[in-house]
Amino acid sequence: MYRIRVFGDPVLRKRAKPVTKFDDNLKKTIERMIETMYHYDGVGLAAPQVGISQRFFVMDVGNGPVAVINPEILEIDPETEVAEEGCLSFPEIFVEIERSKRIKVKYQNTRGEYVEEELEGYAARVFQHEFDHLNGVLIIDRISPAKRLLLRKKLMDIARTVKR
């Protein structure tokens, strides 16, 4: 199992590098990430959240775990909805985030094969949230400065726990 990196850890702000090797090490890392995600009752976990600056994440929105490697968002539906999101890197913080209701995506599986699919609702939301992590974008970047200010003390408390 991995240790979850929390707000204040520099790896969360980096743009992750593409995956180039689809080998047993990648598969083992993904298995460990899935185990970690389930242990913390998450529905998604991006590689940067466990200290790995590479472009992949795992998610499970009720249909079993999926590994998403080198993802792209091909189309974003202009229709959006606001819903509450949490994040394993922000313990006990939940914020309202506006995201597209439907997206068309492309990614690679653990064999390096390309997968294209359309996601909607909760699956689209989780994909967009994890995709943000790969670009160094966090949930607090998607809320207003006023809301961020209200969370300032909690954020400072979380950042203080980071081992440097």
Swiss-Prot record:
One of its GO terms (biological process) is translation. Keywords: Hydrolase, Iron, Metal-binding, Protein biosynthesis. InterPro entries: Peptide_deformylase, Peptide_deformylase_sf. Its cofactor is Fe(2+). The keyword Amino-acid biosynthesis does not apply. It is an enzyme of class 3 (hydrolase). It catalyses: N-terminal N-formyl-L-methionyl-[peptide] + H2O = N-terminal L-methionyl-[peptide] + formate. Its EC number is 3.5.1.88. GO terms for molecular function: metal ion binding; peptide deformylase activity. Gene3D superfamilies: Peptide deformylase. CDD domains: Pep_deformylase. The active site is at E130. Binds 1 Fe(2+) ion. Fe cation binds at C87, H129, H133. Removes the formyl group from the N-terminal Met of newly synthesized proteins. Requires at least a dipeptide for an efficient rate of reaction. N-terminal L-methionine is a prerequisite for activity but the enzyme has broad specificity at other positions. PANTHER family: PEPTIDE DEFORMYLASE. Belongs to the polypeptide deformylase family. This is Peptide deformylase. The gene is def.
